[in-house]
Amino acid sequence: MLKRIVQAFFIIFGGVVGIFLIPELFVLLNIQDIPLITNAYTSAAIGAIIFFLISIWGTEYVVNWVKWIEDSLLKAPVPDLLFGSLGLVFGLIIAYLIVNVIPLDNIPYRIFSTIIPVFLAFFLGYLGFQVGFKKKDELISLFSISARMQKKKGTADEEHEVQDKKLKILDTSVIIDGRIADICQTGFLEGVIVIPQFVLEELQHIADSSDVLKRNRGRRGLDILNRIQKELDIEVEIYEGDFEDIQEVDSKLVKLAKLTSGVVVTNDFNLNKVCELQKVAVLNINDLANAVKPVVLPGEEMNVQVIKDGKEHNQGVAYLDDGTMIVVEEGRNYIGKHIDVLVTSVLQTAAGRMIFAKPKLLEKAL
């Protein structure tokens, strides 16, 4: 059936071409004065016959080419075709607008005024198709998130509340850490929790590691995500998109946060700094943990157990129950003992808190 359609197209096309070109051929052959030959019907018939003969050789190639295109389109996923076509249409519209803005009539050579529109249509159409095809995952995710946010809007107060609850994008370190599940359970973290697909893939790689410690950490992270999804009353979204031009997961998180105006949730000190430099909102759960620790002021007294040497000469190291490190000056001689110390200073950073103290017995001796 397709073969006959192609042959019919060749014949019709040949007839049309014959009407316009065969009379010119008759003029060159100097037989334009013969009425029986030089008429539209004869010209159309000659053109149709010529293209019919061409179709005997060329039909198979055309049919095979059409079938190849058909098979390729049928095998392609619907989102690929949809967003590729949208990108193509958008590119052609841009090309049309540009052609109408540029005064092509002022171009000195006529051939350029003819070629430029064709080139722009081809180039921008191809570019639009490629962008729509390769960015389909990101566009789908953004549209789904946008649609979900629109459904939640009602009154003006509700709209303001939804805008305040930005998307919380989790990174790998905060998932493995595990405290994020408890924070979500207490209700301190509002809004929608977004877990990017590339973070899940990184967790999967860690869980499949040959190193026992890494494997346990990866499996713990997957268990934490399972708990957040199934046990906690909080909305969780999986972001299916990816940024193929970016290799690092941290850089992908920053890019996603920029696209969605979301907040990166992490306990990675370096990622925290990168987000600040990129003007991306970030929540560091170490900052939250430090904020809820008991406040310790210089001059306060506490009882600690010195457990090991410090980095400097005669220093000892102790820890509070919450894991805060205490550096005890002249504390090396008290390793393994419980002693009373006086706080001399407190160093607070995004990575944690460190307390400097000295033995109370030493203070009394002075």
Swiss-Prot record:
InterPro entries: Nucleic_acid_metab_PIN/TRAM (IPR052041), PIN-like_dom_sf (IPR029060), PIN_dom (IPR002716), TRAM_dom (IPR002792)
EC numbers, comma separated: 3.1.-.-
Gene induction: Transcribed under partial control of SigM ECF sigma factor.
Annotated residues for binding of Mg(2+): D250
Keyword hit for Nuclease: yes
Molecular-function GO terms, alphabetical: metal ion binding; nuclease activity
Enzyme kind, highest EC tier: hydrolase
Keyword Cell membrane applies: no
Cofactor(s), names only, from the UniProt record: Mg(2+)
Alphabetic keyword roster: Hydrolase, Magnesium, Metal-binding, Nuclease
Limits of the TRAM domain: 295-356
Domain PINc: start-end pairs: 169-280
Family: Belongs to the ycf81 family. In the central section; belongs to the PINc/VapC protein family.
Job of this protein: An RNase.
Protein name: Uncharacterized PIN and TRAM-domain containing protein YacL
Organism: Bacillus subtilis (strain 168)
Top-level taxonomy: Bacteria, Bacillati, Bacillota, Bacilli, Bacillales
